[in-house]
């Protein structure tokens, strides 16, 4: 069939149908979303849960969500800006921080559902493949599916660090090792030690050492926040180990008391009826006093 020119006449515009708003804005991949939210018809009102992972310039958002007609509902959420309360105050968007955020979400969700004692996950971080096994007498493991949005799923991407943290935290997420750091596409082999180094931020530590040797000014400029907190390359692994232990000990978010800000009034308050009448009576009395004193002609 040859090339057919599209004739944009009255019939064309009359039948034209615009795409969904979020597709027009380039925010949602509906091809992937349809498959992520479509549940088996014999499961009726059982929602299909998604592990939603999104990255911004300064934060990581991890949510467990499910779809409804009126919109998505968030069951639980964890953010990288919560990590400072567990000791991680810098590098809140790297692979190690993504792992911590995923772990925090998993522990927070299981604690919310009362499953945190049954499904502890993997307490020893080795970087190897780990899958949650359901207990014999009790509820099954919480199953959800990774939702990466519009991110590129390249090998070693941070989104898989968040997923690995959630899996080690006790969530049941179908996955393989093909996209973790340490997987070699040519030999088809997975090096768990490389993955472990990324989880504990050793790739950052190696770069810190390299930059400190090559260019001291660039090192001080790029890692100024690390230097301010007294962190060097040797202290990074211990930092993340303590963070993992602290997250497991208490995943609940600390509630900060809101400061009371007294509301300012920029206009004068309206007088009551009694105040207005009193003001008029005082003015009359003052005027009569002046007349009696002969001050007014």
UniProtKB/Swiss-Prot annotation:
The regions listed as transmembrane in this protein's record are none
Q: Where is the composition biased (Basic and acidic residues)?
A: 268-277
Q: Among the entry's GO cellular component annotations, what is one? A: nucleus
Q: Which molecular-function annotations from GO does this UniProt entry contain?
A: 5S rRNA binding; structural constituent of ribosome
Q: Which UniProt keywords apply?
A: Cytoplasm, Nucleus, Ribonucleoprotein, Ribosomal protein, RNA-binding, rRNA-binding
Q: What is its main location?
A: cytoplasm
Q: Which SUPFAM superfamilies does the record match to this protein?
A: Translational machinery components
| Superkingdom of the organism of origin | Eukaryota
UniProt keyword RNA-binding, yes or no:
yes
Biological process annotations from GO? translation
* Region entry Disordered, spans: 258-277
What the entry lists under CDD domains is as follows: Ribosomal_L18_L5e
Any coiled-coil ranges, and where? none
Whether Lipoprotein counts among this entry's keywords is no
**Bias type Basic residues, positions:** 258-267
Tell me the compartments it is located in: Cytoplasm; Nucleus
Q: What does this protein do?
A: Component of the ribosome, a large ribonucleoprotein complex responsible for the synthesis of proteins in the cell. The small ribosomal subunit (SSU) binds messenger RNAs (mRNAs) and translates the encoded message by selecting cognate aminoacyl-transfer RNA (tRNA) molecules. The large subunit (LSU) contains the ribosomal catalytic site termed the peptidyl transferase center (PTC), which catalyzes the formation of peptide bonds, thereby polymerizing the amino acids delivered by tRNAs into a polypeptide chain.
Record PANTHER family: LARGE RIBOSOMAL SUBUNIT PROTEIN UL18, RIBOSOMAL PROTEIN L5-RELATED
- Write out the similarity annotation: Belongs to the universal ribosomal protein uL18 family.
Subunit relationships: Component of the large ribosomal subunit (LSU).
Q: Supply the name of the protein.
A: Large ribosomal subunit protein uL18
Q: Which organism is it from?
A: Helianthus annuus
What does UniProt list as this organism's lineage? Answer: Eukaryota, Viridiplantae, Streptophyta, Embryophyta, Tracheophyta
In the UniProt record, what gene is named as encoding this protein?
RPL5A
């Amino acid at each position: 069939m040859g090339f057919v020119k599209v004739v944009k006449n009255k019939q064309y515009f009359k039948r034209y149908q615009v795409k969904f708003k979020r597709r027009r804005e380039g925010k949602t991949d509906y091809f992937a979303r349809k498959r992520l939210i479509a549940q088996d018809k014999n499961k009726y009102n059982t929602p299909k849960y998604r592990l939603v992972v999104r990255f911004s310039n300064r934060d990581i958002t991890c949510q467990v969500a499910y779809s409804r007609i009126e919109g998505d509902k968030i069951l639980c959420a964890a953010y990288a800006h919560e990590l400072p309360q567990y000791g991680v105050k810098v590098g809140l968007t790297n692979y190690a921080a993504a792992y911590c955020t995923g772990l925090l979400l998993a522990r927070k969700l299981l604690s919310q559902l009362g499953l945190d004692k049954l499904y502890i996950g993997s307490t020893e971080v080795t970087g190897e493949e780990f899958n949650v096994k359901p207990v014999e007498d009790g509820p099954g493991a919480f199953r959800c599916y990774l939702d990466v949005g519009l991110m590129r799923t390249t090998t070693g991407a941070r989104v898989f660090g968040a997923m690995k943290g959630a899996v080690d935290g006790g969530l049941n997420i179908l996955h393989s090792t093909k996209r973790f750091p340490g997987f070699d596409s040519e030999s088809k082999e997975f090096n768990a030690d490389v993955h472990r180094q990324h989880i504990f931020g050793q790739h950052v530590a190696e770069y810190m050492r390299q930059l400190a040797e090559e260019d001291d000014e660039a090192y001080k400029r790029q890692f100024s926040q690390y230097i301010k907190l007294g962190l060097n390359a040797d202290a990074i692994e211990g930092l993340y180990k303590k963070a993992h232990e602290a997250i497991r000990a208490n995943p609940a978010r600390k509630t900060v008391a809101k400061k009371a800000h007294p509301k300012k009034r920029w206009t004068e308050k309206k007088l009551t009826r009694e105040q207005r009448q009193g003001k008029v009576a005082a003015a009359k009395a003052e005027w009569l006093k002046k007349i009696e004193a002969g001050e007014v002609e």
